[in-house]
Structures are given as structure tokens and as C-alpha cells.
Design a protein with these regions (language model features):
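C-terminal flanking tails of non-heme Fe-dependent oxygenases
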Residues: 1-186
Length: 186
């Protein structure tokens, strides 16, 4: 299922005073993610390492705000900070795994919250694993086959995350699913 992989070095630019103020004034924690808003990865798995923080000169600095970093939303609707220990690799489930497992696995909604200070960047590495473009995005057939996003499983999606069923159908391949996903987000 995951013969296609690529890595990205992700750089999150320092927040402006305006972005910090908007993040601080957000009505809820769910609305306070200025570095990267809520989304699901549409691939199969995403491997992540602990982020590092840098100043404007590129020197490594400690995280200046313990509330800054990666957050996930679990199936019960709880927003949790994902603290990745040094030297560890963690994985997030993507929507392709959700589809190809018939909903047994569920994609992990996640976002990145910036610090409440200017002049600090965030750096991390993500390893994205995904099907080949022509891979069928069909649920398993046979006994136990079911809808990958049953009723009630969308109730805890964060604002801005389009429901899977609004972008996917059982006749698509991975490339078609990718295009529909990009169109829904952008």
C-alpha cells in the first residue's frame, strides 16, 4: 500500500505580532493555530520527529512557549498536545489508510500552534508514505466491508477539515483522490 515515500523539511516562519494577537484572541483552542491550521494528511502514514526551534539568525533555541507545537484531535473530540521525545519517530494515520482499511484506521486531524513571541521559527522533518497514483482507493470487499467514514465519525472533525465522503468515492484512484482533496482545502 505504501510504495511511494518522500521526506519534507518543514520550516514554519516566525509569527508576526498580528498573527500572535489573532492566535491569543481566538475564541477556542481549536481556533488558535496560526502556524498550520487543522487538516488530515491524505496519504497513508506520516512519520514525524521532534521539532526544533531557531531564532532569526538560524541558531537553535529552546521552545519559548510550552503551548507551541503539534496538536492532534482524538476520536472523542479532545485536543491534545503531541510531545515527541528526542530521538523518537511517531506516525500519524492518513486518509488513504482510513479508506483502504474500511475505516478500521482513522486519519489523525492535526494542527501546529505558534509561540506567543516573534522571532522564533520551527523546523521539523516529515516522512510521507502514500500509495502510487494509480492505486485504487476502494474499501476492502467481502465480509465486514464497510463505509470508511460511518455516521458520527465526522462530528469531531475540526473546523476547516472537509469530510472524507465529500472528496472520495470508491471508484477513485489515489491521484484522483489527491486532486479532490487539494481542491477541497485550497
Amino acid at each position: 500500500m505504501c510504495p511511494c515515500m518522500y521526506c519534507r523539511l518543514l520550516h514554519y516562519y516566525s509569527l508576526s505580532e498580528e498573527q500572535i494577537a489573532a492566535q491569543r484572541e481566538a475564541a477556542t483552542l481549536e481556533d488558535s493555530f496560526a502556524w498550520c491550521g487543522w487538516h488530515n494528511d491524505h496519504g497513508a502514514l506520516t512519520g514525524l520527529v521532534q521539532a526544533m526551534f531557531t531564532d532569526s539568525a538560524g541558531a537553535t533555541v529552546p521552545n519559548p512557549d510550552p503551548a507551541a507545537g503539534l496538536y492532534v484531535k482524538n476520536r472523542r473530540g479532545q485536543i491534545l498536545k503531541a510531545n515527541i521525545p528526542p530521538g523518537h519517530l511517531v506516525y500519524q494515520i492518513g486518509e488513504s489508510s482510513q479508506i483502504l482499511s474500511g475505516g478500521e484506521l482513522q486519519a489523525t486531524p492535526h494542527a501546529v500552534r505558534g509561540p506567543q513571541v516573534t522571532g522564533v521559527n520551527r523546523e521539523t522533518l516529515a516522512v510521507f508514505m502514500q500509495p502510487l497514483p494509480e492505486e485504487p482507493m476502494a474499501v476492502p470487499t467481502g465480509e465486514g466491508a464497510k463505509d470508511p467514514q460511518e455516521a458520527g465519525k465526522t462530528e469531531n472533525l475540526p473546523k476547516g477539515v472537509p469530510p472524507l465522503l465529500s472528496r472520495w468515492n470508491n471508484d477513485m484512484n489515489y491521484d484522483e483522490f489527491t486532486q479532490a482533496t487539494f481542491k477541497a482545502y485550497y
